[in-house]
């Protein structure tokens, strides 16, 4: 799973020259990414080794002066972002043997979401499961692209066959060609385009901003906005809105299954009990039957109201489910949404211990495996968070299921994490975290166990 946080940057690359006076702040890295803290809000700075020798970027900020920290696996630097005035620093790319010259400034930010009092009143305390109309539209377009031929699109349903039968004649439409070209350039475009579609709704044949959200992905602009006219034309010519209406009962059935059998509200209550410093006024789970595996999350706050979004694939029941106990099937199906929702709770807590985690996980060679999915978690903080992510699954299972079901679920989870995903020490980590949880003092929460599990990791 590739997980990106809310201050992910969309960079504009520019050449520039300037007079260099004194030593510039410098951060060194052997990896392809860094961690950014903009006013203490963390985000991933990916693609370091693909950057040109010089580039600029402007962050959207509320304040004229904002602290920025840039952290690698080796060291860190801090600069001040100012509206219209660049802060200059260097990144030494040890893997490439060169240096990137960087100029970062800031500008007044447009809020990603606005929650007026009426919205707060209507949504306070709610957990909503949604298949939005424009959201499904962009996923239909994804299914028609070259990227759609991969496992990123779930194909084992009659619904997928209906999508292809209806929309394949429009595979040559400019909207499909344009989105296909973006995904060919980089699959990293996929999640922001999908997520940002939730900011829109249909008004007749027009696709317009819903009003609550300017953007629902991690960047400072809505990545889908330039392509809205193409999507409007595609929807009109393909009669997409008729297709969506004709399948409303199917969507409603999936949503009902989610509500009755996945029980996101229970997950939210458990997470709030275990991470009492983190609270969300509402939770929205957005999905489509077309997503094969890609998951992502984001959070928003305005006017004293906070909202967590989880973008997930639907947990379809496997072919052999009827041969398994119902409790085992339920546990397996819960994992998809829980491992995305819990990032909104465990990550803010991990940020409080970033320095200790950097020391404990300074040598990742024994924690992740080259050539397996774990290799994508190649900085200490993201590695620890992914271990905790699935460790929390074990803790939740221990509270919800009987001993036999729990043992089966735990064994399967650990096998998958170690053998399939390549997290070498997950069994040890999982056992230690479970032991700490089961032996915690009265009133202690999972958040209180962070120092102990980090100290355990430091001794490995």
For every predicted segment, state its role.
Residues 22-36, 54, 59, 84-85, ...:
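Pan-zinc metallopeptidase signature
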Residues 20-239:
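N-terminal low-structure segments adjacent to metalloprotease catalytic domains
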């Amino acid at each position: 799973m590739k997980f990106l946080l809310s201050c992910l940057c969309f960079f504009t690359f520019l050449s520039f020259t300037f007079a260099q006076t004194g030593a510039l702040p410098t951060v060194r890295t052997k990896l392809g990414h860094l961690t950014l803290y903009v006013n203490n809000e963390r985000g991933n700075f990916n693609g370091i080794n693909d950057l040109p020798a010089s580039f600029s970027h402007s962050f959207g900020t509320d304040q004229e002066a904002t602290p920025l920290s840039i952290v690698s696996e080796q060291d860190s630097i801090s600069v001040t972002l100012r509206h219209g005035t660049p802060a200059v620093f260097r990144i030494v790319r040890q893997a490439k043997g060169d240096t990137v010259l960087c100029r970062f400034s800031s500008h007044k930010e447009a809020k990603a979401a606005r929650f007026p009092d009426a919205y707060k009143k209507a949504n306070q305390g709610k957990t909503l499961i949604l298949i939005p109309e424009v959201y499904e539209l962009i996923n239909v377009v994804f299914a028609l692209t070259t990227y759609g031929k991969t496992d990123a699109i779930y194909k084992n349903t009659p619904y997928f066959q209906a999508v292809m039968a209806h929309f394949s004649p429009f595979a040559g439409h400019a909207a499909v060609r344009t989105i296909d070209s973006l995904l060919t350039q980089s699959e990293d475009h996929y999640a922001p385009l999908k997520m940002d579609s939730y900011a829109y709704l249909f008004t007749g044949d027009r696709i317009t901003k819903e009003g609550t959200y300017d953007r629902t992905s991690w960047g400072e602009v809505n990545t889908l906005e330039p392509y809205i006219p193409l999507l409007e034309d595609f929807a009109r010519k393909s009669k997409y809105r008729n297709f969506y209406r004709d399948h409303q009962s199917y969507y409603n059935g999936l949503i009902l299954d989610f509500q009755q059998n996945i029980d996101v509200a229970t997950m939210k209550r458990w997470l709030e009990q275990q991470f009492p410093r983190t609270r969300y006024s509402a939770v929205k789970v957005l999905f489509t039957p077309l997503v094969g595996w890609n998951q992502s999350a984001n959070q928003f706050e305005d006017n004293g109201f906070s909202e967590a979004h989880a973008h997930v694939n639907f947990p379809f029941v496997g072919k052999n489910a009827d041969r398994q106990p119902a409790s085992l099937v339920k546990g397996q199906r819960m994992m998809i949404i829980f491992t995305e929702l819990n990032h909104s709770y465990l990550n803010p807590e991990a940020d409080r211990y970033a320095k200790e985690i950097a020391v404990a996980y300074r040598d990742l060679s024994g924690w992740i495996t080259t050539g397996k999915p774990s290799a994508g978690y190649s900085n200490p903080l993201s590695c620890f968070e992914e271990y905790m992510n699935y460790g929390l699954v074990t803790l939740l299972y221990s509270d919800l299921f009987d001993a036999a079901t729990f043992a089966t679920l735990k064994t399967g989870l650990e096998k998958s994490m170690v053998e399939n995903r390549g997290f070498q020490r997950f069994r040890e980590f999982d056992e230690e975290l479970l032991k700490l949880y089961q032996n915690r003092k009265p009133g202690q929460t999972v958040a209180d166990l962070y120092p102990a599990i980090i100290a355990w990791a430091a001794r490995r």
